[in-house]
Amino acid sequence: MLFRSYISVATGEIFGAWVDLRPGESFGQVYTTRLDPSRAIFVPRGVGNSFQALEDGTAYTYLVNAHWSLEQKKTYTFVNLADPDLGIEWPIPLSECELSEADKAHPMLKDAKPMAPRRTMVTGCNGQLGRAVRRYVEEHGLEGFEFNDIDTFDFSDPAQYDRFDWSLYGAIINCGAYTAVDKAETLEGRAAAWKANAQGPALLARVAAEHNITLVHVSSDYVFDGTHELHDETETFAPLGVYGQSKAAGDLSVANCPRHYILRSSWVIGEGHNFVRTMKTLSDRVANGELAQVTVVDDQYGRLTFTSDMAEAIFHLLDTGAEYGTYNLTSEGESASWYEIARTVFNLANHNGDKVQPVTTAEYYANASGPVSPRPEHSTLELTKIEGTGYIPANWEGKLEKYLNM
């Protein structure tokens, strides 16, 4: 059966035979029994189902979690119920039964394909984290993944959800978000931030709850006001700006989904535009004589989070079946200011860290032409909880050096 089903008999009696077609050690195991109105049986997804009616007028019923569709049929797997290797002792010889041509054509157990796992949908696949997740999937040869960005599935649009048969999906990894922190303080940006960061996750959480899907969602240090030097997963939200407020709202929605992982990160570095790449470019320009020096804020403290580590941590939680909930995830190591990280990048790139000068956040944005979102002073996240699952984050300084050498 593709579906999970609850089978009962209203009248009469049947002989039922079930073959486990799920991948793993139980593949090919057979279970048989007789059912009458006094008994019922639950059949998990991926277990082949067959029966014989033993009395005239037998009524045999299914309660299923999904219905047949052409898309569903593409995921079916079969085994031939006449295969002697199954050892099924049919009360009525199969030679006396009516079998469809499809039943007769089903493969023997030795040729049967294991039931494929439910699909995993990745949203926001073209962002920094989305690209890291895709790369992880490709490098590990994982199957059953579907990658979407806003052009193929805008998860913040309620009208787009009916396009999918959600019973086919076992997990959603939401890598999409609105991350223009300062632009979120504008009229246009505020609406966009709330649509992507609050409404979108709420819609994903609803569909995940309705279809028993595990939802993976990424949070931000901006849900806190930064007054505590170290933030654990139990700290109360106190976002300072619109971006942080919209992310906090999304977190609250996802937390109501029974099967969820929220990974809270800070200072994300991956493929594409980010702070480290900007500092590397500026270091090169200083080395080439195009710039004399640069200024970087020295009153915000935290740790970098590399998207390659985020992807590994996501699959670690999914694969190990860790307890659902919220997990902080950054690189480990001493907290540092943006200024200290910039000096490290300059020294690694061109040994010119002395050309980075410290400045306060207020001084840095003193001449800004547009709105500026308030930033948390302290963004360092406590990592004890995720380490308790067996995932040990890498040191940010070592990861930074490897990142610059890629």
Which residues fall in each region the model found?
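Mid/C-terminal beta-alpha module of Rossmann-like enzyme folds, strongest
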Residues: 313, 320-370
